[in-house]
């Protein structure tokens, strides 16, 4: 995307979660329209600049893509500093990555405080491999939003960024007026699959709200 107007604001986004959950894939889908079929563990951090052309002007999000593996844990706090928003990703087909959402959130809040956060359950195109049991619906009590996504099928890949921009700009009516470059999906995400996922997440959101640090993920 080549915007015709000057960037109105630049925001730092920290992208965290266990290795293999699709963090780098999400960034590359927006940056190049490509999906990485082979996963390579990110070494340290990669910073990618994503431009979003909205009805409120052009905004840039600098996405800090950190390594999700524990051996890099000592480096994470430094990358969290001055982050204005965050995405925490887990793989709906991996219970381990789902179980670690609470830990990632705790580490993030300890450094950054109450910044806007999106929790993304990625790979919902693999419905038959789903292992998580219930949603992590924090948005009614904290500054967090839960979304289902599939980077491989392009399902909801723009939604986390639009939500965060609305929070950061303070305008719930903010919309994209030009979509980032995204290639056709690698798999077809049918309407029926979409209805199943939406039903599952709506059911989770109707459950009594737990205390964030006492959640049995």
Curated annotation (Swiss-Prot):
Keywords: Cytoplasm, GTP-binding, Nucleotide-binding, Nucleus, Protein transport, Transport. The keyword GTP-binding applies. Belongs to the small GTPase superfamily. Ran family. Residues 68-84 are annotated as: Switch-II. Found in a nuclear export complex with RanGTP, exportin and pre-miRNA. Interacts with tamo. PROSITE patterns: RAN. Residues 37-45 are annotated as: Switch-I. One of its GO terms (molecular function) is GTP binding. It is found in: Cytoplasm; Nucleus. It comes from Drosophila melanogaster. GTP binds at residues 18-25, 36-42, 68, 122-125, 150-152. One of its GO terms (cellular component) is cytoplasm. GTP-binding protein involved in nucleocytoplasmic transport. Required for the import of protein into the nucleus and also for RNA export. It comes from the Eukaryota. Residues 7-171 form the Small GTPase Ran-type domain. This is GTP-binding nuclear protein Ran-like. Gene3D superfamilies: P-loop containing nucleotide triphosphate hydrolases. CDD domains: Ran. The keyword Glycosyltransferase does not apply. SMART domains: RAB, RAN, RAS, RHO. It holds the Pfam family Ras. Signal peptide: none annotated. GO terms for biological process: protein export from nucleus; protein import into nucleus; ribosomal subunit export from nucleus.
